[in-house]
Swiss-Prot record:
Its main location: cytoplasm. Residues 378-393 have a biased composition (Basic and acidic residues). GO terms for biological process: protein folding; protein stabilization. SUPFAM superfamilies: Hsp90 co-chaperone CDC37 (SSF101391). This is Hsp90 co-chaperone Cdc37. Forms a complex with Hsp90. The gene is CDC37. The lineage of its organism: Eukaryota, Metazoa, Chordata, Craniata, Vertebrata.
Length: 393
């Protein structure tokens, strides 16, 4: 049977309570509320003091019993007179503390009864059943760094490169679906990335037919990954759904697939072309660095910057013609051009002496079709003009 007596004394103010006309209702409610809060604070303070006193008494009793036990262990037979007196003192203290403990517990029990009989109010009418809620939420995934992604891709390729290439060579929908069913670990971003790189490599190697075959499987994998993102599921859980959809798709869906395939092949061709051009630039720069003369100038660039009459001298490999041409030029201009020829290695001073001495100093062949092994003698120092035109380093 339900006991409804607990509802008989509820101390809750009601705006509809009747009050005397000469009494301000709002002030009366405010006074009642303040008095109720003060009573609750006083009761809470009394409860805390009793609880603190009870815990302190228990602590002292436990400490006294511990000392008494240590004394009994140290002097099991009762010990000397001093030890016996200490034991009696501790026993008396323990007895007194037990009596105090019972008093504290009695006061606590009276306080609990008092609390139980107190009328309910807006503060005590209900209590929290729990103070927190726990939800099973998916842990936030930390974004991988570029180094982690690269290492993950490298490890995956080392383990499954043969299987990825086998998938890339398939063509029929049923064959692709069956192979992925047997190897579901291939349905991932790493497989798609490897196929993209493979397509570019094949285009660079001018294997266009094979590139188009692998490109088809690349788009298949990318469509599966996009479907997984849209459905917010693991790609391995939806690749069968993709094949079911693609095999029964309408003309518009197939056109979308084919358009994406053609656009991808164009991007592959563009990337392959850019890679080839970059490789050619690197090769040309490497060759240019090899050609640089002792002064850090490129002989090709220097030759092309020479006046036509000087270019003819290098083309003909005629030292006398070179001397005559320099003698007719302005000394400052002649010195400028010849110094550039020396810095680029196009002209090597004392070439004959260096060759006879077994040195490495030999004139570089000029880039006008002349033999690169040819050696040029230094211009004779007979005239001031020729000496100035030689432009010694």
């Amino acid at each position: 049977m339900v006991d409804y007596s607990v509802w008989d004394h509820i101390e809750v103010s009601d705006d509809e309570d009747e009050t005397h006309p000469n009494i301000d209702t709002a002030s009366l409610f405010r006074w009642r509320h303040q008095a109720r809060v003060e009573r609750m604070e006083q009761f809470q303070k009394e409860k805390e003091e009793l609880d603190k006193g009870c815990r302190e008494c228990k602590r002292k009793l436990a400490e006294c019993q511990k000392k008494l036990k240590e004394l009994e262990v140290a002097e099991p037979g009762g010990g000397s007179g001093g030890g016996r007196g200490e034991r009696e003192r501790l026993q008396a203290e323990a007895q007194q503390l037990r009596h105090e403990e019972r008093n504290w517990e009695s006061k606590m029990e009276e306080l609990r009864k008092k609390e139980k009989n107190m009328p309910w109010n807006v503060h005590t009418l209900s209590k929290d059943g729990f103070s927190k809620s726990v939800f099973n939420v998916k842990a936030e995934e930390k974004e991988e760094t570029e180094e982690q992604k690269e290492q993950k891709h490298k490890t995956f390729v080392e383990r499954h490169e043969k299987q990825i290439k086998h998938f890339g060579m398939l063509r029929r929908w049923d064959d692709s679906q069956k192979y992925l069913s047997d190897n579901p670990h291939l349905v991932c971003e790493e497989t798609a990335n490897y196929l993209v790189i493979w397509c570019i490599d094949l285009e660079v190697e001018e294997k266009q037919a094979l590139m188009e075959q692998v490109a088809h499987q690349t788009i298949v994998m990318q469509f599966i990954l996009e479907l997984a993102k849209s459905l917010k599921v693991d790609p391995r859980a939806c690749f069968r759904q993709f094949f079911t959809k693609i095999k029964t798709a309408d003309q518009q869906y197939m056109e979308g697939f084919n358009d994406e395939l053609e656009a991808f092949k164009e991007r592959v061709r563009g990337r392959a072309k850019a890679r080839i051009e970059r490789a050619m630039r690197e090769y040309e720069e490497e060759e240019r660095q090899k050609r640089l003369g002792p002064g850090g100038l490129d002989p090709v660039d220097v030759y092309e910057s020479l006046p036509p009459e000087l270019q003819k001298c290098f083309d003909a490999k005629d030292v006398q013609m070179l001397q005559d041409t320099i003698s007719r030029m302005d000394p400052t201009e002649a010195k400028y051009h010849m110094q550039r020829c020396i810095d680029s290695g196009l002209w090597v001073p004392n070439a004959k002496a260096a060759a006879e001495g077994g040195g490495q100093g030999g004139a570089h062949g000029q880039p006008g079709g002349a033999d690169s092994e040819a050696l040029y003698e230094e211009i004779p120092k007979e005239s001031g003009e020729e000496e100035g035109g030689e432009g010694k380093a």
